[in-house]
């Protein structure tokens, strides 16, 4: 299969899912998957429950899609499975921890996450991960890998994962845009046909800003669509061996969009007109530019799409993906900011 055909097929496969999600997920019914009864109330006899959310399922699925993409790209470079799994676990472990710690530091809230902050930590932690892999590879007679191709793989995988993972924000109603009424006339006309409207009192946009039922800038859908579109373009460059161009396109877009998109958001992201997240993104753009200019890239590196696909179709890889999704879902899927009150009864007509 040619690289262009693979890119086209993937894009066409994702498009219907994205278009459906942009219209369906802001509805009230797409927030809670299930509720688990945990404790029975003594006063009213009702059960109190913990909610399992689509937010967790979608965020885990987006992260998994990014991990699968990264696995495919490094497999196409000839990196053995043990090396790929090690880099995924190392970088993702740092990023997942940073997603909560950075959000707590910036927003002063315990029950929140920052994907943008996690991305910065991922970019910073990958060079040590590559150095560690190469050190082990020398001892084990495994292929060595240059830094820039791996950074390109990471940046592209992040964008593709972000495109799916951002759908979680549509389900929960977080990371939401400004009301159209707060925009200037020209900007309002631009966004009006695509405005997002969220429903349900347990959506974050409702309880944090009182904007349920109000048309807002579709910032989550815009981020998702652009991330997938730019990610696919950068993926094609990667598969064609243009690693520096792929890395710069994916990384600079992801970080630059973080800076720009915040001007259209209404949710709290810390104090100041230029938020801490925007500052981190700006520093990240400089870091990525310097890395692309001076980082090592073997000009003889070639990708083999068939080898990458073959690396995915392996029991060890498949079990790893299943375990990764389950762990991420458990970590993010149990709601700490919503609750449930449950009652049970016998259906007499079925007896």
Please annotate each region the language model reported:
Residues 1-351:
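Hydrophobic, membrane-interfacing alpha helices
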